[in-house]
Amino acid sequence: MPTSLTRRHGAIAAALLCLVLVAGLVGCAGPGTGAGEGSGAAGAANSGDTANSTNAAATGDSAPTGHVSAELPPTDPEVLVDDPQPKLPVTVDWDGAEVEVASVDRILTLDRAGALSRMVWALGLGDRLVGRDTATDFPGAADLPQVTPGGHTINAESILKLRPDVVLTDGSIGPSRVLDTLTDAGIPVVRIPDERTPDTIADFATQVATTVGLGEQGEKAGAAIVGKLDAATRDAQTRADGRRMMVLYLRGTTVAMIAGPESGASSLIERLGGVDAAEGLGMDGAFTPLTPEALVKAAPDTVIVMTHGLDSIGGPAGLGSLPGMAQTPAGANASVLDVPDSQLLSFGPDTPRVLAAMADALYGKAAA
């Protein structure tokens, strides 16, 4: 797989191509590279399967109804390392290519979710960030120069002007030739693995920490994040009502995809105490195009979306007009939860706070 695409965002790109080439095509497959592959099973339900498996829309008093939002006001990630003392140089080879990092005085992180910058901040090195990507939207980074003004693309000149000592990326921002140019210019470019779910946050913390010379401190930080996440999980599951949920990735009226297990959506829903409505669709990748048949078969009680994604289709009313949505309990009851784009599937140090905010929105705030 090209280094310019992570598994999750590679799956999105492949699904978008399918949608563009064949509108409404059932069973579009993702790139044939394993984990980034989107299963076509989500769109394979025939009319008989749909008729036999569709759940009647919940209409009782206990049915989740209405539009709710996760309350996540912008805030800096919690700093988990009080006195970071990087031990350098270090040599890392997360993607199979050895890279030596000799200095972390000037750090640049590049990823679509902003998870790398948040982890660097949590490790106590936020003051060493010299630029930011679009998703790095927390207050402490607001004054940093943005190197992705067009969204998710970079150019070598703007980065070279920042004189970074090291660039951390997961490959979700490119093009890859720009990263190659930076390497040719003598800048260490470290590609952090992109396999991130709520269950891999400790590994993610260790990978970033090791790269910046904070290996042991990073392990402790990762353990602290996991402890907070497990506590948020227990709280959410205590209040859960067992509803069926589905995470959708939406961009305008022409892009609608189901988030599968490798996007981290399944684990997130389980931690919320819900049932992943997409489980019965046979998905084994990160994302796959949404079809009316798959939506009706899944029969979610609540749909979870990114805030800007919901806005891009006209809000809850636009969501309700998606083909097949009205035939689901979520559509019949207009049950939707929106979460800030940079938080929903980023899976980093903020995930415990995100999970807690989602649980509060879904089930009501816990009694003090």
What name fits each language-model region?
Residues 84, 105-162, 166-171, 277:
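A short, structured surface patch at a secondary-structure boundary
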Residues 155-169, 187, 291-305:
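Proline-aspartate-enriched helix->loop->beta-strand connector
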Residues 200, 204-212, 302-368:
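Structured C-terminal subdomain patch of bacterial secreted/periplasmic proteins
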Residues 2-115, 216-246, 364-368:
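Bacterial Sec-exported substrate-binding components of ABC uptake systems
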Residues 258-287:
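Alpha-helical, coiled-coil/dimerization segments enriched in small aliphatic residues
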Residues 175-178, 190-207, 242-267, 311-314:
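Extracytoplasmic ligand-binding site segments that recognize negatively charged/polar headgroups
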Residues 101-105, 116-120, 126, 156, ...:
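Extracytoplasmic/secreted envelope proteins and their assembly/folding machinery
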Residues 147-155, 195, 282-290:
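Short helix-initiation/N-cap motifs at beta->coil->alpha
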